[in-house]
A protein has these predicted regions:
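Electron-transfer interface patches adjacent to heme c in soluble/periplasmic c-type cytochromes
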Residues: 26-85, 94-417, 421-434, 442-583
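Bacterial N-terminal signal peptides that target proteins for export
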Residues: 1-9
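C-terminal motif of bacterial Sec signal peptides marking the signal peptidase cleavage site
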Residues: 19-21
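Intrinsically disordered, low-complexity terminal tails
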Residues: 1, 24-26
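N-terminal cofactor/phosphate-binding cores enriched in small/glycine residues
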Residues: 88
Length: 583
């Protein structure tokens, strides 16, 4: 370990937060020697093993106090870091309609770039208003029917509030209202003041979107709205490398004393249901392990099972609506297509401006008549799945003005995935500190580690590989399975059990079930992003608030550990917080 790591940790306390994060441009200044930490790093100290300094294992940890650094697995392979840096560019910069290499934005989109939602590659920030172009706004709108928790069908699952002219965005974001409410009393009966007299406060969001905000036909009815924030993208490939069998064993162990999500777990058979394994109608993930796909483990709702078809792999498509060879359809809905095809302003604008084969409106122009344009607008915008691939390719790929040119090439997507799989977890800090060591002991003693499982060992990392990467591998004569960073047999320390739990909070997450979020690296958030907001909707402004939300209700799966935390003296509570901010 070099001195640079420790110099940067100290410098990180003093420098202004960064809002972008290119790999090596954020190196901290030399502010002096930190001999004690230098001597302790990488060695067993107190109740920490030597391995715990490396949360991502030896192949997945960076010495830098950064969320954007490449892993040693990337750096160890000749040429891969160059692909990593190119992939990083697709994350850090904004997409446009026609300007290469980041072209293809729209016709409707959630954001015009990734960095808006992941400031410095970390967790999104709490917002008081919804604006898609605000850097740090990691919120996705969750609009669903409360009777069955199903997403509404009139807008996309990740609702879009932006569109290119002349189309009207599916939702007018100017009509979205976010109001932050104060908790006046805990449903569980716990006081808003700790026994030693220190007070804490809790807030939660109420979100309203009037029906008039929807530019769809029909407009939705009987719906509720929640917010879900992005989390950090670093280290996700390490979670991808954990064997399904090891995750199943964890669920089985917890099933002995807890109720698990029946959508995932068969309590009678004491095993996962078929629905717990990921598959998609547009690829072969469902056959990755013979008769089934990889086990779901990504997103709060545990909807994704492979990083190569996970939240990030999909986001580069559905957040921007930038298509690629294995995504020849739009992120859209029939209700939006119908509304746009019936809008006189839309039709008139295309009639005036869409006749040239070089115009991005040309695919919608048809024969230039109002009737023809309306019919074509509906036909092109109503391509929401692989079933509409032929229509998409006819008008939005092979026809003018695209003329067969992909918006994102197979090579570019491969480079994006090298970056995505190659993001390192920052090394742990201050493990030689006596308070941090006491905090670790207390964290386990009061039961936090029951859900925030400290450590896992990855398997062989026999990952599923997507069609775009395979196509690029074929072009250059390589084996696709050897082209992405791998993390086999690594001892990692993410502090998650990869199980869904319920906390029964006010205005809770959509279904009530939420995957335990990894804690690794979160202690750097304020330094790197300027905020320390936590939980699925950023309702927790501090670690203490995040913990106390776990005890809002006595029904919470984490009520007992929270009650114990509540009754600890302040010095012990502070030690737990210091531990969480160090791992």
């Amino acid at each position: 370990m070099t001195n640079d790591f420790f110099k940067m940790v100290l410098a990180g306390l003093l420098v202004a937060p960064a809002f972008t994060a290119c790999s090596d441009s954020d190196d901290a200044k030399n502010l002096g020697e930190l001999e004690a930490e230098e001597q302790a790093f990488g060695k067993a100290t107190g109740n920490f093993t030597a391995e715990e300094w490396f949360p991502g294992g030896k192949l997945g940890t960076t010495e830098k106090a950064s969320y954007s650094a490449p892993t040693p697995a990337v750096q160890n392979i000749a040429g891969m870091e160059e692909d990593f840096n190119t992939g990083e560019d697709f994350f850090e910069h904004l997409y446009t309609f026609e300007q290469a290499p980041r072209r293809g934005l729209g016709p409707a989109w959630v954001r015009n770039g990734c960095i808006h939602c992941h400031p410095s590659y970390g967790h999104g920030k709490r917002q008081t208003e919804y604006r898609a172009n605000t850097v740090g706004n990691g919120y996705l709108l969750v609009i669903y029917h409360p009777s069955n928790n199903a997403y509404i069908s009139e807008v996309t699952g990740m609702p879009q509030t932006q569109a290119m002219a002349p189309f009207k965005a599916p939702i007018d974001e100017n009509q979205i209202q976010i109001e932050w409410k104060n908790v006046t009393a805990m449903e569980s009966g716990l006081s808003m003041t700790f026994p030693d007299g220190e007070a804490y406060s809790l807030i939660y969001p109420e979100v309203r979107i009037p029906q008039s905000a929807f530019n769809t036909n029909p407009k939705p009815t009987d719906y509720d709205v929640r917010l879900e924030s992005t989390i950090g993208v670093y280290g996700t490939a390490l979670l991808d490398a954990i064997d399904d069998a090891d995750i199943e064993a964890q669920w089985a162990a917890e099933a002995k004393h807890a109720t698990l999500n029946p959508a995932m777990w068969d309590s009678e058979a004491n095993t996962f249901k078929a629905s717990a394994y990921y598959s998609a109608p547009y690829n072969d993930t469902g056959k990755h392990n013979g008769s089934r796909g990889p086990l779901k483990r990504f997103t709060y709702a545990m909807t994704r099972g492979s990083l190569q078809d996970g939240a990030g792999a999909n986001a580069i498509w559905n957040i921007t609506n930038v298509t690629r060879s294995d995504r020849h359809w739009l992120y859209t809905t029939t209700a939006w297509a119908k509304a746009q095809s019936e809008d006189p302003e839309v039709i008139s604008y295309i009639k005036q401006h869409g006749s040239s084969p070089t115009s991005i409106l040309y695919p919608y122009y048809a024969d230039g008549t109002e009737e023809g344009i309306a019919k074509r607008v509906y036909e092109v915008l109503n391509t929401p799945s692989v079933a509409y691939k032929e229509t998409f390719e006819k008008y939005l790929l092979n026809g003018a003005p695209y003329n067969g040119v992909e918006e994102m090439t197979d090579k570019q997507y491969y480079q994006f995935m090298v970056w995505h799989r190659g993001l390192a977890v920052p090394a742990a800090r201050n493990l030689n500190d006596a308070d941090v060591q006491r905090g670790k002991a207390l964290f386990s003693e009061i039961g936090c580690a029951n859900c925030h499982r400290p450590s896992w060992t990855t398997g062989s990392d026999n990952m599923w590989v997507d069609a775009s990467t395979k196509a690029y591998a074929k072009q250059i004569g390589k084996n696709a399975s050897d082209m992405l960073p791998k993390y086999a047999n690594q001892t990692i320390w993410p502090y998650t059990d990869l199980v869904q739990h319920r906390l029964f909070m006010a205005n809770d997450i959509r279904t009530g079930w939420c995957r335990t979020t990894p804690l690794w690296g979160r202690g750097l958030s304020r330094r790197l992003t300027g905020a320390d907001d936590r939980l699925h909707d950023c309702r927790a402004r501090t670690v203490v608030e995040a913990i106390m939300w776990h005890g809002y209700s006595k029904q919470s799966d984490a009520y007992r550990p929270t009650e114990k935390f509540y009754n600890l003296p302040k010095s012990d509570r502070d030690a737990i917080v210091k531990f969480i901010e160090s791992i």
